[in-house]
């Protein structure tokens, strides 16, 4: 997959990913931040994407993993505060 095709696919799933991010976060601003972080991570790891595999599934996995990592970080920080 060339860079143009990758970015075209990335733009095509943005709206759907935003809805998924909102379901995860229940907050518009956090959903936008999660979408942006996911898009940047995908662009940074474009070379790791295997062409002819499920691009949308790959993006959902990145988003879910970022959300889980952020959640764990928040819980860990709250544990230290208490």
Task: Please name every model-derived segment.
Residues 1-19, 32:
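A short, charge-rich alpha-helical start-of-domain segment used by transcription regulators
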Residues 7-8, 47, 78-81:
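Pre-signature/interface helix of ABC/ABC-like ATPase nucleotide-binding domains
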Residues 19, 33-40, 44, 53-65:
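Structural recognition of an alpha-helix C-terminal capping motif at a helix-to-coil junction
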Residues 30, 37, 77:
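Acidic-residue sensor for enzyme active/binding pockets
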Residues 49-51:
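Short alpha-helix-to-loop micro-motif enriched in aromatics/charged/Gly
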Residues 61-81:
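Arg/Lys-rich amphipathic alpha helix in sigma70-family domain 2
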């Amino acid at each position: 997959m060339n860079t143009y095709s990758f970015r075209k696919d990335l733009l095509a799933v943005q709206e759907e990913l935003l809805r998924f991010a909102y379901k995860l976060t229940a907050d518009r601003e956090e959903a936008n931040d999660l979408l942006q972080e996911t898009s940047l991570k995908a662009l940074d790891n474009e070379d790791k994407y295997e062409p002819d595999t499920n691009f949308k599934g790959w993006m959902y996995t990145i988003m879910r993993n970022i959300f889980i990592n952020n959640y764990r970080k928040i819980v860990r920080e709250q544990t230290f505060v208490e």
